[in-house]
């Protein structure tokens, strides 16, 4: 799995954890090990520009995903996973920090960035949360992936509750 994490934000983040949880999420979703993903960490000004340009919405947001090859997990266990360019995930640590502090289960900026990384991966794989049933499916997968990764890394306590809506 080729995953690049590029921190352009000026904020210190746990890039290794972002890389690790992205790799874990893609493995859990059975994406081909030769697929490629890029994660870019930006400041609020850059995120706001992207949010306006691509979503026509004001202000910065926490995470944006830009799919390339529209890879999907294999439908069957014996099916060969697809290979290709997943696309880009853009994260904003300043927004993540605020969301982590304001969440019902307060957590760190890095924990929020881990959650948002999984959220971005799921968007790249075609998951969405516009409709209630889609939201339940996506957030259920997101929680299972984050919990699984935390368990494998010996992290205890409750996983961050979803802060993206």
UniProtKB/Swiss-Prot annotation:
* PROSITE patterns cross-referenced by the UniProt entry: UPF0054
What would be an example GO MF term here? RNA endonuclease activity
Q: Where does Zn(2+) bind?
A: 119, 123, 129
Task: List the GO cellular component terms.
Answer: cytoplasm
Q: Which UniProt keywords apply?
A: Cytoplasm, Endonuclease, Hydrolase, Metal-binding, Nuclease, Ribosome biogenesis, rRNA processing, Zinc
Q: Report the InterPro entries cross-referenced here.
A: MetalPrtase_cat_dom_sf_prd, YbeY, YbeY_CS
Cofactor(s) needed for function: Zn(2+)
Q: Where is the protein found, in the record's own terms?
A: Cytoplasm
Q: Which residues form the signal peptide?
A: none
Q: How is the cofactor bound?
A: Binds 1 zinc ion.
Keyword Zinc applies: yes
A Pfam match: YbeY
Q: Which family does it belong to?
A: Belongs to the endoribonuclease YbeY family.
User: What is the role of this chain?
Assistant: Single strand-specific metallo-endoribonuclease involved in late-stage 70S ribosome quality control and in maturation of the 3' terminus of the 16S rRNA.
Under the heading PANTHER family, the entry gives: ENDORIBONUCLEASE YBEY, CHLOROPLASTIC
Protein name, entry field:
Endoribonuclease YbeY
Gene source species: Streptomyces griseus subsp. griseus (strain JCM 4626 / CBS 651.72 / NBRC 13350 / KCC S-0626 / ISP 5235)
Gene this chain is encoded by: ybeY
């Amino acid at each position: 799995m080729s995953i690049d994490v590029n921190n352009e934000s000026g904020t210190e983040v746990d890039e290794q954890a972002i890389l690790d949880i992205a790799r874990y999420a893609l493995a859990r979703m059975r994406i081909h090990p030769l697929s490629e993903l890029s994660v870019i960490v930006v400041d609020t000004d850059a995120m706001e520009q992207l949010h306006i340009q691509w979503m026509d919405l004001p202000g910065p947001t926490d995470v944006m995903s830009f799919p390339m090859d529209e890879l999907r997990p294999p439908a069957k266990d014996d099916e060969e996973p697809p290979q290709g360019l997943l696309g880009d995930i853009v994260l904003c640590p300043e927004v993540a920090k605020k969301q982590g502090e304001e969440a019902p289960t307060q957590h760190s900026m890095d924990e929020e960035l881990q959650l948002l990384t999984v959220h971005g991966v799921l968007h790249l794989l075609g998951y969405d949360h516009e409709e209630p049933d889609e939201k339940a499916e996506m957030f259920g997968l997101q929680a299972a992936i984050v919990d699984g990764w935390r368990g494998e890394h010996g992290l205890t306590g409750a996983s961050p509750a979803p802060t993206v809506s």
